[in-house]
Amino acid sequence: MAMITNDWLPAVREEFAKPYYRQLYQFVKEEYSRTVVYPPAEDIFNALHFTPLSEVKVLILGQDPYHNEHQAHGLSFSVLPDQKEIPPSLQNIYKELQDDLGCKIPNNGYLKKWADQGVLLLNTVLTVRAHQANSHQGRGWEQFTDAIIQAVNAQDRPIVYMLWGRPAQSKIPMLTNPKHLILKAPHPSPLSAYRGFFGCRHFSQANQFLKEHGIEPIDWQIENIN
């Protein structure tokens, strides 16, 4: 696994010494050696690499990495730029962005532009076996990503959480900082998007909150890739 070298390291360093993380590390190492696992090992911590803790403005919490090839690269909901097929949940996110902020729907699902602006695109589980959804659940990633969420909660500045669906919303008891804004909606998957994700206007609400606190809003428009 790639090393964490930015300001996330002091925030999560204690986790590496805990028994659960040693077991998790051994499990993940063995999985990569004997089967196909996504994302590529060097991309596991991309959410942290691309969005330093000191720059987090928004946290969008996903669950499991995409489990088909050429999709997962360490950012929740995002797929690699050469992947022309946009996953259904991300298609619905783009539809909501179009309705909410007038964003044009792009021809790709590569969300690094958001990460570079301070949107932490975090999954609660950071690896998965190819074609086996949820195959690395319950192995320790949840405890590690809880430590990441707790580090964000401890930041003494305005931050927005977008929590879509019950698994993401199960983290709400951890979010105790009165300076932070929690936005809740159903998951954008085709199974639940029409139950309240469409029309939630989370993106404009987040930008309004950031602007009210003197923070540069997010440019949510993802550009086309030729």
Question: Which role fits each region the language model picked out?
Answer:
Residues 2, 7, 14-160, 167-170, ...:
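A polyanion-binding, active-site-adjacent surface
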